Amino acid sequence: MNITVTINGETYERDVDPRRLLIHFIRDDLDLTGSHVGCDTGNCGACTVLFNGDAIKSCMLLAVQADGATIETVESLSANGELDALQQAFSDHHALQCGYCTPGMLMSAKHLLDQNATPTEGEIRKAIQGNICRCTGYVNIVEAIKAASK
């Protein structure tokens, strides 16, 4: 099936297998490997992207369902190789260890901050509740998102 999708401001037209998941289309067909595949079942959130402005788990959507959509992946955050404020806050607050969950956490946090520039700690925790981190215990992640909101 032929689809046209805009990812990180660039429009792609591709023929895709109707059974192909969006995450595999993004990573394997377009070579945008910043989003991670953790579970392929929608549980971990490592594959979170912004889909028409909403945070979604890209392992839960078929690529053909993205026809006509606008998608932002973690690659959209940095410009000219420089970290954006959210990425810098994650670095400054040691909000990552292994880094596997980080792309999904960043995109969930971006979605929150796009909707609410000054979220409470409770709102931050709710926004990232679909993202699993087995390393940090979430404290530094929450602190990083708070710092990025200032």
What are these regions (language model features)?
Residues 1-150:
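Signature of N-terminal electron-transfer/Fe-S-associated modules in redox systems
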